[in-house]
Amino acid sequence: MGRFREDMETYKRNDPAARSSLEIVLTYPGYHATVLHRAAHWLHTKAKLKLLARMVSGFSRFLTGIEIHPGATIGRRFFIDHGMGIVIGETTIIGDDVKRFHAVTLGGTGKDTGKRHPTIENGVLLSAHSQVIGPVTVGEYAKIGAAAVVLDDIPAHTTAVGLPARVVRVHTPEEIERDTTIGGNL
C-alpha cells in the first residue's frame, strides 16, 4: 500500500486542481492507470501470469484511455496529467519523478525481440504530444517539448524540441539544483 499512497501524494503535489486524496482515488485516470499498471507489472514479472497481466492492462486502457504494457518498468512518483492517448511500450524503462502530459508515446521500432522502447531517466518532463521512439535514452531532468519527436539520445539536463527533436538549451547549474532538489521538472 505504501507505493499507492506515494503515487497519490505525487498527484496531490503536482496537480494544483487536486482538492483531496479521495478525489484523486475516485476521479484521476492517470492515478488509476498507474495503480493498475503496478498490479499488472507484478503479475507480468513476478507471478509470471502474463495473460492475466494483459487483461488488467486492457481493463486499464478501457477505463482510462492510457495504454501501458505490463512489461514496462515505471519508477516511483510517476505523474500523468491529462492522460488520454498515452502509450508506453513493453520494454520501456521509466525512472523516478517522471512527469508526462497527454498523448505522449514511448514507442518501439518494430523489432521483434530485445530492447525496442525508450529509457526515460529520473526527473524527465515529457510535454503534450511528444513521441520518443526506439531504444533511445532521455537523460536525467531533460525536458522534451510539446510535439517533439525524439529519435536519438537526449543528454541529461537539456531541453529538446522539434521534429526530429534537437537540444536547444542546456540547463544552468542553478536550474539543475532546483530540479533535482524539488523532485523533478515543474
Question: Predicted regions: what is each one?
Answer:
Residues 1-64, 174-186:
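Terminal amphipathic alpha-helical/low-complexity segments used for targeting or macromolecular assembly
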Residues 61-62, 66-168:
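Structural signal for interior beta-strand "rungs" in well-ordered beta-sheet cores
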